[in-house]
Amino acid sequence: MIDINNANEFIPHFGEEVVSDTLTNNNNRVFAISDSTFENYENYCKLFEEKGFVKREYRSHGSFHFTAFEGENTGIFAIFYGDIKEINITIENESKYFTYSDILGDKKVSSQITQVKLEDYGMSYVIRLSDGRFIVIDGGRNYEPHVDNLFKCLKESSQDEKPVIASWILTHPDSDHYHCFIAFCEKYEGEFILQKAMFNFPEPDAYHLYHDLAKVGYWGCDTERLPHMYEVLKKTGAEVYTPHTGQIYEIGNASFEFLNCIGDVVHHTYWKNKNELCLVTRMEIEGQTVLWMADSSCKYSRLYEKYGSYLKADILQITHHGFGSLGDNEEIACYNAINPSVCFLPAADYKCYHRMSAYRKSTNHIITKMDVDEILTGGDGETITLPYKAPSTAKEEYKQKYARGVMDNGAHCWYFTGLNTADKDDFTFSFLNAINQPANVEINIYFKDSKDIERIKATVPYSLNEFSIIDKEKVDGDWLFHNPNSLSKIEIPENTEFAVRFISDIPLVIFHKDHKDTYHTSYVK
């Protein structure tokens, strides 16, 4: 019988050259076979049956194939990603997948999703099932308001004296996602019932199994509370399940299919941080599909390459609070495939429209280029009843919030006139960038009766900055291969009147200590 201790005696088995072998925790071993074929995948499936495993499940969509095998106390979950030619085989000792069950009670209430109120950002979602039980996804930080808001949501929506949580799904060990679970269980011990918990990250004694964890920033202030989490979880008496990609769990009247987990990314050399090991889930409920992305990186999880049009969903939880996740183009490809009608964005309005999210390339694509009916941010808390259709006014509401955020942050284009080269201070400007990302600014200098200097490039970091626009240590005047009017090729005339134009990719405020701007404007898409 194959198990995690002897699996390397059987894998690789068909002459493959590129095989990764990783223990992801004490009971799970993952093999990734690159540049492979569907024929090899079928051969592995036959091999597992020859070794005494029973095929329990098979499903496919597009070029994706999933097969689950049950052995004595061991499960094997084999995937073929046809579009990237990769076989992924997870071997799990003490697997509970085949004994999992959940009993759906009589219908008592309508199904709902609540995005729990957040002061800043985090991830806290409550799904109310038709039988009155709940699913919690993450929970947020261990801040008292996060903890209390979550309990209040459960208590007010519950049909029972004690809210019954059918399953608490923890997507990854980041403080703004799982720390609330610890504080919630401690503060409200005995006031709720937790039936099951689902997550896929290492036990406290399994960190030695990972490669270069310190280098990729896995262990630190976010993850050091994992041992405490396990202690708290044990006290709840909940059954614990480790979901793997391809598995489907029926929870009440909701169905969860897992599209990504640590086993998909941990073996790759490009693995950078714990966001990439997020559980990504495709939930079906009340005839609608919801895609929960947590903080997943579309680039490194390769979601679009693996699933393509299967990602289509009615409702999307925008990944990583809309902050971007290491790969704008890959995120945009995913969002286009998902093509949602409604989006959840787990960040407060301020964080989204004034500080960060709306100005990240991929999130901005959703706001300005996709025909999304509604974007629900987390600042006030939002509850939708399923099946859900956005109100007719919702699109205009988020468009107005975005336009207001742009105007409040400044302008994209600024002109200053009446300057003179005789005063070197006239070349020095102050820049207030209130958005938490660098502004890319192009600068043109127009001299009276002399050649202009064109397309000076400057990067303006977040916060207040001051520099001379002709200081070659602060600006790049020669970044273009061919620019006859570059900073190094045009001599600055003496005692000459000049004007300056700034064009920025994000709104900012530009000012001069001696001169008021002549004109400024913004373009809101």
Kindly give the residue locations of the regions a language model identified.
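Core dinuclear metal-dependent hydrolase active-site scaffold
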Residues: 94-163, 234, 242-312, 383-399
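Active-site metal-binding motif and surrounding structural segment of the metallo-beta-lactamase
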Residues: 132, 144-203, 307-323, 339-343
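Binuclear metal-ion centers of metallo-dependent hydrolases, dominated by the metallo-beta-lactamase
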Residues: 196, 204, 208-257, 271-274, ...
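Amphipathic alpha-helical segments
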Residues: 10, 35-56
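Gly/Pro-rich, tryptophan- and cysteine-flecked surface segments typical
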Residues: 399-525
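Active-site environment of divalent metal-dependent phosphoester hydrolases
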Residues: 121, 143-144, 173-179, 204-207, ...
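Compositionally biased P/S/T/G-rich terminal and signal peptide-adjacent segments
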Residues: 1-32
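Ser/Thr-rich, low-complexity intrinsically disordered terminal regions
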Residues: 55-78
